[in-house]
Amino acid sequence: MKKKHTQVRVIYWIIIAIGSGALGMYMAKTQWNTAVLALWLVVIFLGAMAVEMLWFRSLGKKVAALTPLLRTDPDKYIAGIEDLLGDVRSLGVQQTRCINLAAACCEKGDYAKAVDYLTSLDPRRIPAVNQGAYWADLALAWFHLGQNEQARAVIDGNADLFTRMKDSRGLGGLAAVLSVYYAKSKGDLELAWERYYAAREAWPDPSTQKELDRLEKVLRKATEERK
């Protein structure tokens, strides 16, 4: 993907070079016009911005087109994300890459790898739009790895975010799952079961139901051990 981006940039700057040459020849034959030069510089700047914006928009659409694979074929999703984003140096793109790869690793059950991807990022530099997915997947991975204190620290440290997340169409199911894990990790099985049944009813989407299937086994085992 980076190669195509470079090609677009090269073509743009070739056009700019030709235009600059033509403008230089014109101004050499006529009276020097500062206004024309200033206008040309503005055109160059705005053109460069437009090229970047169009490329990133195209890239975003291609990433979005891979989304169905995240649930059905996470390995293919990972390959697609790496093909699109793996060689792009932009910090924002690499943040998106790591967050998306971590989500795919969670789908595969490779939670240690998900943690590796997420902890490689500086959370202070992650845009607000990605904060929910970042912290939710990190908490989920920590819970699955048995690192309950670290998982709860993630949730407690971002309490306002997780409260808002409960009503999110995209992340509400995951937030509900995490609330069950949280109660279970604190030893409150009664509350955990209560939240579990509420999540079953409120979030019928396949992804949440799949996670709740796993969680049910955990709760049943904990309940049996307590008897």
Where are these regions (language model features)?
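Terminal, low-structured helical/coil segments at or just beyond the last alpha-helical repeat
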Residues: A17-I18, D188-K227
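Helix-turn-helix repeat elements of alpha-solenoid scaffolds
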Residues: A35-W40, L66-E82, C106-L118, G146-G157
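Amphipathic alpha-helical segments of tetratricopeptide repeats
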Residues: E82-G86, V115-R124, D156-K166, Y197-A202
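Structural motif corresponding to the intra-repeat A-B loop/turn of tetratricopeptide repeats
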Residues: K108, L145, Y182-K186
